[in-house]
Amino acid sequence: MGGLAVAVHTTQFEIRKPEVGLFEPVLRVTKEEMDTYEARTGKTLVRVAGACGEAEQACAEARTAKALGFDAVLLSPGGLAHRTEEELVERTHAVAAEMPVIGFYLQTACGGRRLSYEYWKAVADTPGVVAIKCASFNRYQSIDLVRGVAYSARREEIALYTGNDDNIVADLLTPYRFPVDGKEVELRFVGGLLGHWSVWTHSVVKLYEELREYRDGRDIPAELLARGAAVTDFNGVFFDVAHNFAGCIPGVHEVLRRQGLMAGTWCLDPDETLSEGQAREIDRVYEMYPHLNDDAFVALNLKDWMA
């Protein structure tokens, strides 16, 4: 089962500004498109909406998402560094009372903070938390999160999703094992919630299906690990790691523009543009990894999609 997350980072947080007013319209249009897709294909999509801000704002956004038929909210901790971990857990409880919650470990470079094992266990213990996205971009912190879930009595009720764009393939291949009450508990990331997956998506789906074949414990070929390094390389270019992610969203837009899916790279914030040299770096990864893009697939379907 696949899904779609909207009103999250790649959608641009500025949609929430009163003078922009696009939060509800974006959710509504996306809902309509997902309805159309499900009716045409008979498939079911998991519908995730982003929720941000203090508890009052996040609860209001959750109510909007619920009214539009979304399944869960991805609850961002961004901009809440002044809150204690206990206050963040209380916020999670409040939003989970509105609708199912996906917890979110956000990297510090994008407004997140270090969160403890105890915090993640408390989040996992929260009724209504159905999943957690780990985008710490840090292996130590990723283990804190997974260990917190492993030691929660609700561990079997929570799906783990990687948001670590710097470690996608390894995250999806790695079993995490912990001794809990005299027994070994194994957890894995079951999928990804990744801005990176908004581009070259057809290739992403094929890679994900291939990675799933190695969950039975068989030996992992070195070629897959090499491909993981390639994915990290071109992700770093799209997300503009060289400039501390300043051109992250324009980088995604540029890939979509080259494929004919967008008319330009504009963002709601006019100062958010491609960084110096980023377009050349996108040229480089296109040349280095032609087998990993999905340009041919997009070209084959573009006329129908844009009709």
Model-derived features with residue positions:
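Short, solvent-exposed polar/charged micro-motifs at secondary-structure junctions
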Residues: 57-60, 144, 171-172, 277
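Surface-exposed charge patches
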Residues: 63, 206, 254
